[in-house]
Design a protein with these regions (language model features):
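N-terminal low-complexity, intrinsically disordered tails enriched in Ser/Pro/Gly
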Residues: 1-77
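Short glycine-/polar-rich loops that comprise or flank the Walker A/P-loop
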Residues: 79-82
Length: 92
C-alpha cells in the first residue's frame, strides 16, 4: 500500500489518507449515484504490523469510520459500511 519507506514507521493518519485516496480512485458513476468500494485491505511491513497489532480492531473501526465520513462528505454511495482488514503476509 505504501510505496516509500517511513523512517519512523507508518502512522494511522497516513493509512487513513491513503484509504480515502483509494476510495476516490475507484469510484464508479451510475445513472444517478457514485458508488465506491466498501472493502479495503491494508498491507503493512512486519514492523509496522507489530506496532499496531495490539489495537488492530480499534484501528480498523476508526479507519472504517473515516472512510464512511469521507464518502458522506463527497456524496458517494456505499452498499455497506466500509470494512478495513489487514493482510498479514509480509510486505517488503
Amino acid at each position: 500500500m505504501f510505496s516509500r519507506a517511513f523512517s519512523s514507521g507508518v502512522q494511522p493518519v497516513e493509512i487513513a489518507r491513503k484509504l480515502a485516496k483509494e476510495m476516490d480512485a475507484h469510484k464508479t458513476a451510475s445513472v444517478s449515484r457514485v458508488y465506491v468500494p466498501n472493502e479495503y485491505t491494508v498491507w503493512l511491513a512486519p514492523d509496522d504490523y507489530a506496532r499496531f497489532k495490539d489495537y488492530e480492531t480499534s484501528l480498523a473501526q476508526e479507519l472504517s469510520a473515516h472512510l464512511l465520513e469521507h464518502a458522506r462528505r463527497n456524496e458517494f454511495d456505499l452498499l455497506t459500511r466500509p470494512v478495513v482488514g489487514q493482510d498479514r503476509k509480509s510486505v517488503v
